[in-house]
Structures are given as C-alpha cells and as structure tokens.
C-alpha cells in the first residue's frame, strides 16, 4: 500500500510527480466516489498548467465510481462552493494549489451544501481508500457521465445581492490585481453589471489574464514582494482602493488610497460594520488572535461579537451554531452565512467599496482611525523546540497581574491597556504571537519585544 503524502490536515497539496499525478488524482476520484457515494458532483480547476489534466483524471475516477460529474471549467474555489450549494449536488472538488510554488498542485473537497471535507470529516477515509487502491471493477452500466456547464451568471447574481448598487453614488476607481490567477473572468462579469446599472465604478486591471506560467510571480499578496505592482497601480491611477487576489481568489487583500497594504485584522472590522448597517443586531464571529478593534466596532454598531477558535472548520461550525451573518479571520479568510458559511474573496471588496460610498469617506481615513485606536503587532512567528513549554513559561510570567485570561486558542492574556495571544501552529513547529494595545503604539511595541525576549 502506497502512502499518499499529498493529504494534509484540511486539503490535498503535493509536489507534482511523486506526490501528485494523474494516477493519484484518479484514485482520489474513485475514493471520493466510493466513500460518499454521491450521485452528482461539480469539479473545477485553477489556472495552473496541470490543473486541467488532474481534473480530468479525477473526473474519470468519479465516473468509474458511478458519479455524474459537472465540470465548471476554469474557476476559483468559491465558484465550486457556490455551484455545490446552488445546484443542490452532492459535493464539489476544486483542483488548485492556491499560492503554493509552481511545481505543486492540490485539491479542496466539499460535500453537500459545500460543507468542508477535512481530516476528521472524511478526508482520512478518502486517503485510506486511495492508498489501498482496491476498488471494485468498473460497471459500465452504472458509470457516470461528464458534462461541461457554466454557473458564472448565477454566481455573479449572488455576489451582487450583497450590495445595493443604488448606494454607489460617487465615482470609484478600483485597481484589481488577479495575479494571472482565476479571478479575472469574475471581475469582467462584475464590471458588466456595474456598467449596465450606470454605476460610476472604473476597474484598472493588473496581471488580469489567466496564465499558469505566472509571469509576474505566484499570486500570494501576503508576501510583501507580491504587493508592489498593486501599490504602484494605486499610486499611478490615484485609485480609491487596491484589490489583490491569491491564485484561487478565496482571499482578497486590500490597499488604501495611498497604496498602503491593510492588515486583515482591520478588514474584519470594516466588514462587520458593513453587515451591521444592513442587519442591526446580527452576530459576528471573530478569532482570538486580535479582538479589541472588532469587538469595539461590533458593539458600537449594535451587533453581538462571538469569539471562535482559529481555523475555517471551527469558525464555520460556530457560525452555524450562532446563526452568525459573518465570520472573519485576520488571515484574510472571510465567511458568509448566505454563502453556505463558506469563505469568499469577492464579497469582501464589494462590501468595502459600498461602505466607502455610504460613509463618503476614503479607505485611508476609515482604517487609520481604527489602527490608531487599536495598534497591533501583526502575527509574529517563532520557531521553538518546545512550544508548549514556552507558552507555559509566558503564562506563568503574565497571568498573576492579568485582568482576563482566555484559552479558546492558545492563551490570550488581557491587561486594561494591552493584550496578547500566543498559540502553537496546527501545521508547523512554531508559536504565533499577536499583541495589541489601546491607542498606545509604543506600549504595544515594547510589550511585543518583551514577550519575544522571553521566548528565546
């Protein structure tokens, strides 16, 4: 029995060749089909050069297991989520490696209603079946079919339902950097909707054409070197906002009108405010790493903040429990109740653009006030031999004088004027530190250095 190392905690990712190839993709399709026994599922793929061949091998495996396959073609992950819940099919698989290096590919798997399939919700079972590779003979009489379809119109209809075009009362200039990934065709369709409604929004498109050679680098705007082209275009065109996507556009990253990159933490607050203007009293889910800005905005706007452990499975589950309208992580993952609790990289920028018009404000001024009120360190990673021992040591140092302690995810320790969260990574031998203060950048910086010194 071969061990398939491409199966990770939440998805499938591997180096092309030994770790992931067409034979393995076929086996994954067979395993998904044998385990879940779906009648019909959707598949799609990103722009990577191997995505089409891997997707077709995957589809062959699904069909040999008796599953009918609907292929939506070039797509971002959220288009698979949408197609799965909108069409009412039994599951979906997107072939994507998002922002991984060129020589990688992968898959993201969901079941009915676009519910995620990860380690403890079926991924280990699919892995076991794919590794054993002992599938029953193919029955030609019950072999599935393959059909190409498009859900682009219905998907963009859904996106446009989050905003009211009548609110776009002033001209907006938006730089959109698709990173030669999968986002371009969606932006083109959204642009048509704005134009048809006579809405004065101009799109300046950077690295717009899908190109699996990634001539401008792998699209991962979390890396500072991947931000320059977006920032330059914002400056050159004097744009109101810059928007940059990763390869499968399940995350979007925003730049203000002065071309400054906005940390994901402050975007959560903006989106919470946007939703609470539409639905006062709604519940908003946030993660424990940085919280004060989000809690402040939610309570000021009449909403209810609810904290969840970090990670998409935890946030989606908590959103369902609480019937929360929106959940946000500082890592640029944003989840929406009406999007089957899935994350979307398209909904956030639409809501922020609408908010700019509603508040008749620049993005710089909206965010600068929040950054001044709650300055944050951003996430700092440190490799440690014994992470648990380090966290215990930090806790012993800071707990006695603390105003509040929370262990939802690692440890969060609060004092009246500053707080921090220290947690281990689910995937690497590192600890992750986040520090924030109340309107005191010097204090936040000093405490960050103090804790980092103790971690050595």
From Swiss-Prot:
Pathway: Nucleotide-sugar biosynthesis; GDP-alpha-D-mannose biosynthesis; alpha-D-mannose 1-phosphate from D-fructose 6-phosphate: step 2/2; Bacterial outer membrane biogenesis; LPS O-antigen biosynthesis. This is Phosphomannomutase. Involved in GDP-mannose biosynthesis which serves as the activated sugar nucleotide precursor for mannose residues in cell surface polysaccharides. This enzyme participates in synthesis of the LPS O9 antigen. One of its GO terms (molecular function) is magnesium ion binding. Binds 1 Mg(2+) ion per subunit. It comes from the Bacteria. SUPFAM superfamilies: Phosphoglucomutase, C-terminal domain, Phosphoglucomutase, first 3 domains. Gene3D superfamilies: Alpha-D-Glucose-1,6-Bisphosphate, subunit A, domain 3 (3.40.120.10), Alpha-D-phosphohexomutase, C-terminal domain (3.30.310.50). The active site is at 98 (phosphoserine intermediate). It catalyses: alpha-D-mannose 1-phosphate = D-mannose 6-phosphate. Disulfide bonds: none annotated. There are two duplicated genes for manB and manC in this E.coli strain. GO terms for biological process: GDP-mannose biosynthetic process; O antigen biosynthetic process. The gene is manB. The keyword Metal-binding applies. Mg(2+) binds at residues 98, 246, 248, 250. Its EC number is 5.4.2.8. Keywords: Isomerase, Lipopolysaccharide biosynthesis, Magnesium, Metal-binding, Phosphoprotein. Its cofactor is Mg(2+). Belongs to the phosphohexose mutase family. InterPro entries: A-D-PHexomutase_a/b/a-I, A-D-PHexomutase_a/b/a-I/II/III, A-D-PHexomutase_a/b/a-II, A-D-PHexomutase_a/b/a-III, A-D-PHexomutase_C, A-D-PHexomutase_C_sf, A-D-PHexomutase_CS, Alpha-D-phosphohexomutase_SF. It is an enzyme of class 5 (isomerase).
């Amino acid at each position: 029995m071969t061990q398939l190392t491409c199966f990770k905690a939440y998805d499938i990712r591997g180096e092309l060749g030994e770790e992931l190839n067409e034979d393995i993709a076929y086996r994954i399709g067979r395993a998904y089909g044998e385990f879940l026994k779906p009648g019909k599922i959707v598949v799609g793929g990103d722009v990577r050069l191997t995505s089409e061949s891997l997707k077709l091998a995957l589809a062959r495996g699904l069909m040999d297991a008796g599953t009918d396959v609907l292929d939506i073609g070039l797509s971002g992950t959220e288009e698979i989520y949408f197609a799965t819940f909108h069409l009412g099919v039994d599951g979906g698989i997107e072939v994507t490696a998002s922002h991984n290096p060129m020589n990688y590919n992968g898959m993201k798997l969901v079941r009915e209603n676009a519910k995620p399939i990860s380690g403890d919700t079926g991924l280990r079972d699919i892995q076991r079946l794919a590794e054993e590779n002992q599938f029953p003979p193919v029955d030609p009489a019950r072999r599935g079919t393959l059909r190409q379809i498009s859900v682009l119109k219905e998907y963009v209809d859904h996106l446009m339902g989050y905003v009211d075009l009548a609110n776009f009362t002033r001209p907006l200039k938006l730089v959109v950097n698709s990173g030669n990934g999968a986002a371009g065709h969606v932006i083109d369709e959204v642009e048509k909707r704005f134009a048809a409604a006579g809405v004065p929004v101009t799109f300046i498109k950077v690295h717009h054409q899908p190109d699996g050679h990634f001539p401008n680098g792998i699209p991962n705007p979390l890396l500072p070197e991947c931000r320059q082209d977006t920032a330059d275009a914002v400056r050159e065109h004097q744009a109101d906002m810059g928007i940059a996507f990763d390869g499968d556009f399940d995350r979007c990253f925003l730049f203000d009108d002065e071309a400054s990159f906005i940390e994901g933490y402050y975007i959560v607050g903006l989106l919470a405010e946007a939703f609470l203007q539409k639905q006062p009293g709604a519940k908003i889910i946030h993660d424990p790493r940085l919280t004060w800005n989000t809690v402040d905005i939610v309570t000021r706007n009449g909403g209810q903040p609810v904290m969840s452990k970090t990670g998409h499975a935890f946030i989606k589950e908590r959103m369902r429990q609480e019937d929360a309208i929106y959940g946000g992580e500082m890592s640029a993952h944003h989840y929406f109740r009406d999007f089957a609790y899935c994350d979307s990289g398209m909904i956030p920028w639409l809501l922020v653009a609408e908010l700019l018009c509603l508040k008749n404000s620049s993005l710089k001024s909206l965010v600068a006030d929040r950054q001044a009120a709650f300055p944050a360190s951003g996430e700092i990673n440190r490799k440690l031999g014994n992470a648990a021992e380090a966290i215990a040591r930090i806790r012993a140092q800071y707990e006695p004088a603390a105003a509040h302690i929370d262990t939802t995810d690692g440890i969060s320790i609060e004092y009246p004027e500053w707080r921090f969260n220290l947690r281990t990574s689910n995937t690497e031998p590192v600890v992750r530190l986040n520090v924030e203060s109340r309107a005191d950048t010097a204090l936040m910086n000093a405490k960050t250095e103090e804790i980092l010194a103790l971690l050595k």
